[in-house]
């Protein structure tokens, strides 16, 4: 029953030895030999969505050149000379009792005064638009502040600018939610959640309406000139209405400042007509294909109008976006649904 014992087996210790890692000589770094670098914050990065807007703004921004300064200096010198000549002519006409010349000089002075007054009004409106950017910076600081007292005064100022009195339901809900223990950040967050959406909803409604009208107009328009004129008119009207909603009265220069992105929209409308005509000759003369191509071009124009409206909201809105920034995809779904419904009714 007992099994015999197996003989002993002796193994040689011939396992390979792992080579020890070789240590490299130490390196000492100092400030002189090192390469200087500076960290890049995420705020400095330009998002892909706003790359086109940044490029157009940089292209349209006037360059501070020597020729520009010389022209401005010449215009200023000419204005001073004309004013001095007018005063001298007025004095001579009064002494010589030349009533006809005196009347002409007086009429010219009134016209010049009206022009200067218009320039002052335009400057004030442009300054109001720039002041809105400063208010956004103040609001951004208050959203990171733990102080007390500044937030409520700032929000009441924004409500007055937007034309919301103390009897408005949104203002009443906001005031009822306030507590004396709330700091500036909490007061501003309550305003952004209870009052600001009232204006944002109206602005979104205006954007949706203008985008839908642009889509349907481009879809049925046979002429590129009509497309361009209609889009320009609709976008001007959209900018004016959005600015008025947020309490900003636009002048000539401030309207141009907000209307820069319309250049993309107009250029797209003119080019889309050419692409559509070439595509029609290349594809077919079928009616269904023609309608689908026109609808696609209309959706593209409507999306660009919606993007212009979103940009106008960003420039006119007194508060920075928290988590409620409108997306282009929301308007895209609405436009596609409206175009599909229109095509089905047409059949």
UniProtKB/Swiss-Prot annotation:
It is a multi-pass membrane protein. It comes from Pectobacterium carotovorum subsp. carotovorum (strain PC1). Residues 1-20, 30-49 are annotated as: Disordered. It comes from the Bacteria. It holds the Pfam family DUF697. This is UPF0283 membrane protein PC1_2326. NCBIfam families: hyp_HI0043. Residues 1-11 have a biased composition (Basic and acidic residues). Keywords: Cell inner membrane, Cell membrane, Membrane, Transmembrane, Transmembrane helix. The keyword Membrane applies. One of its GO terms (cellular component) is plasma membrane. Belongs to the UPF0283 family. The chain crosses the membrane at residues 70-90, 100-120, 213-233. Signal peptide: none annotated. PANTHER family: UPF0283 MEMBRANE PROTEIN YCJF. It is found in: Cell inner membrane.
């Amino acid at each position: 029953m007992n099994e015999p014992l197996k003989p002993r087996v002796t193994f040689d210790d011939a396992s390979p030895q792992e080579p020890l890692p070789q240590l490299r000589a130490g390196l000492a770094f100092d400030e002189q030999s090192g390469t200087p670098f500076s960290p890049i914050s995420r705020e400095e990065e330009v998002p892909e969505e706003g790359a086109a807007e940044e490029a157009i703004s940089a292209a349209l921004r006037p360059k501070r050149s020597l020729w520009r300064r010389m022209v401005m200096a010449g215009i200023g010198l000419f204005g001073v000379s004309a004013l001095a000549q007018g005063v001298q002519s007025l004095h001579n006409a009064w002494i010589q009792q030349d009533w006809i010349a005196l009347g002409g000089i007086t009429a010219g002075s009134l016209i010049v005064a009206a022009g200067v007054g218009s320039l002052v009004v335009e400057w004030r409106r442009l300054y109001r638009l720039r002041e809105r950017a400063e208010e956004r910076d103040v609001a951004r600081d208050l959203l990171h502040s733990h102080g007390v007292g500044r937030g409520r005064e700032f929000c009441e100022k924004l409500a007055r600018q937007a034309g919301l009195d103390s009897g408005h339901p949104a203002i009443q809900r906001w005031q009822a939610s306030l507590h004396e223990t709330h700091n500036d950040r909490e007061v501003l967050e309550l305003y952004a959640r209870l009052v600001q959406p009232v204006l944002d909803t109206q602005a979104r409604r205006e954007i949706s309406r203008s985008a839908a009208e642009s889509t349907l107009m481009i879809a049925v328009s046979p002429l590129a000139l009509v497309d361009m004129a209609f889009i320009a008119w609709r976008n001007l009207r959209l900018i004016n209405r959005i600015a008025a909603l947020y309490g900003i009265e636009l002048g000539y220069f401030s309207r141009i400042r907000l209307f820069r992105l319309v250049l993309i929209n107009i250029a797209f409308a003119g080019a889309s007509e050419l692409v559509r005509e070439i595509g029609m000759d290349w594809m077919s003369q079928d009616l269904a294909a023609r309608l689908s191509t026109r609808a696609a071009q209309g959706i593209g124009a409507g999306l660009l109008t919606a993007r212009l409206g979103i940009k106008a909201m960003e420039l006119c809105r007194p508060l920075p976006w928290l988590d409620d920034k409108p997306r282009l995809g929301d308007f895209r779904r609405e436009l596609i649904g409206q175009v599909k419904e229109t095509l089905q009714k047409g059949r």
